[in-house]
Amino acid sequence: VPGEDDAFLTNPYGMMYEEMTASCFLKINHDGEVLFKPDFGELNYGFNKPGYILHSAVHKARPEVGCVIHTHTPAGMAISSLKCGLLPINQTAMRFLKISYHDYMGVVLDLAEQEVLVKDLGTAEAMILRNHGLLTVGRSVGEAFNWMHRLETSCRAQLAAMACNTPLQEVSPEI
């Protein structure tokens, strides 16, 4: 949230992603206190504790980060489940040669996971959460979205190439 270093926006637990609009976000602080909750009428959408733990960890550790995006797309979840992870098989995927990985530790409900998560992310703009999904960060929503769009595109391209059932041509890391 611009001008509020201790606050960020997150989606409410239970609301479908396709239902989200700008007015649906909850504003919470790094301690997990809800600072603003829209009136959802009879629908009492709750607080997303796993989302809070994940997002607040990054915001606290990386003050330059203005936005954290975390997705569970089919392509992202598929690549996150492969031992090989994301391969440098095309120009877009080569942007992620230094991508971070975080091993699955179950549903993120323990604040203790924050330390491991932040250590695994390091200074990277993108991380694959093994057996879970994708995460990108940026100084702005646009920057984080741009990283996510490229990461998602790379995951889709890799799955399409792997479906051809022929050896993949990886690009040399020296390039």
Q: What does each of the following model-derived ranges do?
A:
Residues 1-175:
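Glycine-rich flexible loops
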